[in-house]
Curated annotation (Swiss-Prot):
Ranges that cross the membrane: none
Family stated for the protein in its record: Belongs to the UPF0246 family.
Pfam families per record: H2O2_YaaD
Species lineage: Bacteria, Pseudomonadati, Pseudomonadota, Gammaproteobacteria, Enterobacterales
Gene Ontology biological-process entries: response to hydroperoxide
UniProt feature coiled coil, ranges: none
Recorded GO CC terms: cytosol
Designated name of the protein: UPF0246 protein YaaA
Gene symbol of the encoding locus: yaaA
Alphabetical list of NCBIfam families matching this protein: PRK02101.1-1, PRK02101.1-3
Domain of life: Bacteria
Organism: Shigella sonnei (strain Ss046)
Amino acid sequence: MLILISPAKTLDYQSPLTTTRYTLPELLDNSQHLIHEARKLTPPQISTLMRISDKLAGINAARFHDWQPDFTPENARQAILAFKGDVYTGLQAETFSEDDFDFAQQHLRMLSGLYGVLRPLDLMQPYRLEMGIRLENARGKDLYQFWGDIITNKLNEALAAQGDNVVINLASDEYFKSVKPKKLNAEIIKPVFLDEKNGKFKIISFYAKKARGLMSRFIIENRLTKPEQLTGFNSEGYFFDEASSSNGELVFKRYEQR
């Protein structure tokens, strides 16, 4: 199984590292093209394009300027330990064993606007470039056109390497849109997480994001290899609802805490 998750806007380059092992991103030539385009933007243009504050725009303009392709442990950090959003709160990769990192390196991929596809131990320099941003480039009007089939092809390589044809889509719609399902050599399973609020079950963004991380951790810790094993997921009160599920969608629910 190949697990797909989104990156995070929040980054952590300060906490102690729990592994010293690392690999290098496989699509850095493409990243360099995007950095070249991003460096043309002024901080006010970045602010408008990304809908972020002037302060954040200044930080990200500096990141684009400082980015350089020779990644080392001194100027970069393993992606799975650098991202710190809601998904990664659930994943808690900082508590992984070396065996967990081994399994994750084979079975987990992070989709990225700048790096395309990241393996957990791939070094990553800090950036902010969300997949949905309309950054014009030599290949088209946005990042979806820039990446084209590249991300899908890289995922197919990972599937072939593990002799498997199942993708667990735990990425957001914004990021999964960078994948071409018809060209992906895989059955796609999408777990959906619903929380009860006022007697009704619905997707609550913060909880759903954290649950995607919890599910990723569940798969990694238990070394799961078959989609049917996912139905045993019960972290933090979630349970599998077979009646609401279908072949491609596994629905998990959690009752409101009273």
